[in-house]
Swiss-Prot record:
It is an enzyme of class 4 (lyase). NCBIfam families: DhDoxPGlucAldDagF, EF_0839. One of its GO terms (molecular function) is 2-dehydro-3-deoxy-phosphogluconate aldolase activity. This is 2-dehydro-3-deoxy-phosphogluconate aldolase. It comes from Salmonella typhimurium (strain 14028s / SGSC 2262).
Amino acid sequence: MQQINFYRQRVAINVLAKDIANAKAIYEAAEGHAVIGVLSAQFATVEEGVPEVKRWMAEVPSISVGLGAGDPAQYYKAAMIAAHTHPAHVNQTFTGSGFAAGALAATGGEQTHINALVSPTGTPGEVVISTGVSSSQGTPARVSCEAAVRMMQDMGAHAAKFFPMGGEKSLPELYALATTAARHGMTLIEPTGGISLDNFGIILQTCLEAGVPRVMPHVYSSIIDPQTGNTRPEDIIRLMEIVKALV
């Protein structure tokens, strides 16, 4: 069965891979504490995505079905691919997370972790929840972190994904969201956007200090070799060294 293997039950990293060989190398470098993203944006249809995701799942024990740069248009494909494959994790917009939870429940996929994407406002304690296909085109819906977390729980999401963070730019906001998540029994937070080897430590530390039980930072382009397109296993090893130093 697919599952997220958190280091000391606290931290896993969500990363991309060029292909299955790269995914296996990364997973090994992370000592099993990595979740490998497969993006829905690359598939024209759900039917095209399902066999490919199954192929990855057969080789890697922890697969995350992604949107692709938080693209809200991918919410349906991501949810339905996940419902047909039951990966360890699926990424969702805030508004799409309930749909994904329903699709997974209907197919016996309750073990799949679902996140709900909220965005920074510039004000700690408030987030934007209008991250869906239509809502992202209209007036931004700013709500308190508490309202956002409680609504995620109502919809069946397990985690708050905070994107785009812009690296350290949104640290006070991340801390506010993480403390709120912890206070209301949400067990996972996923900081995303502009995370690199240089700021990974401070971002992870911020979440851990907030008291949220589990953290899964998404680290993408900063650890991908632009020449080969491969995520660098040596960078994964360095990320894990930071994790071990902080947990």
